[in-house]
Amino acid sequence: YMNNLTYIYKFYNGKSCHIFEISNDYNEIQTLKPEHEFHNFSAIWSKYIDLSESSKNDLPPDEENVYITSPPNYESGYSLSRYYTLPAFNRNYKTTSMFSQSDNCAPTAAVNLCYYWYSRNPEKYASLKQDPRWTNVHDDFYNLMNTHDGSGTSDFSIASAYEDYFNQVGLSCKATLHFTTDFGQKIVDELDNSRPVHLILHDNRTYGEHSVLALGYYQFEYNGSGNSTYIRIADGFSESPNRYVWGGCAGYWNYVTVIPK
């Protein structure tokens, strides 16, 4: 990148090189080799916006009912990879279908966050659990978040619900709503503090509008072209936390940090 333009070099069989010059409006592309002409500019650009053909096997699935369970299947040519999960994360989590209400993904994610802290330190966080099935905890969050059948939960109602619930059971926490995640990097930063994250997916092709609990990550670093980040989640549909969401997927993410005191 220089002079307000991006230059892409593509090598063919180690013998020839095509140089593409892309202007910063993302709509114009031209080769610097006059014998090669491209007319479908947007199609060419879309090939490179996804971290390039040379650095990935296939793009991660980004469609309905297709789940990511093995991020390395979609990455190659990286210089470094990092894998991390929270301590004591691997257990069976609650799903939305375990509770009677509908459009209840945010309360379910909140139950799973409380369940995580309770399981990690049952002495300190004993009061987070009210009943064996966590039904009362779910119902409390459903009400505290002003969740409604048909419309779900507003992002703006989640943080205050955590603080209210922790206070209600004799504990305290600092909960904060954050906007966007820098392709998942901000979730990585928070997980590195050894805390789960309430992750809110918007316009996601697999999950639509959905809340999940972030428990770990897989991150691949490419020299000169940034990172590709996958967040490991308890998604509220499967009890096992073995699915991931990709930081480069369609839509956008907000998130709530919850710091017990």
Summary of predicted features, one role per range:
Residues 4, 25-151:
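Active-site-adjacent structural segments surrounding the nucleophilic cysteine of cysteine proteases
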Residues 7-9, 117, 237:
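Tryptophan-centered motif/residue detector
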Residues 1-22:
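Exposed beta-strand-loop-beta-strand "reactive/processing" segments of non-cytosolic proteins
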Residues 103, 112, 143-221, 225-227:
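Predominantly the structural core of cysteine protease catalytic domains
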Residues 14, 23-33, 184-186, 192-193, ...:
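Active-site signature of cysteine proteases
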Residues 8, 16, 172-176, 219, ...:
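Ser/Thr- (and often Asn-) enriched beta-sheet segments in non-cytosolic proteins
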Residues 1, 7, 104-106, 203, ...:
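Tryptophan-centric aromatic hotspots in well-structured domains and transmembrane helices
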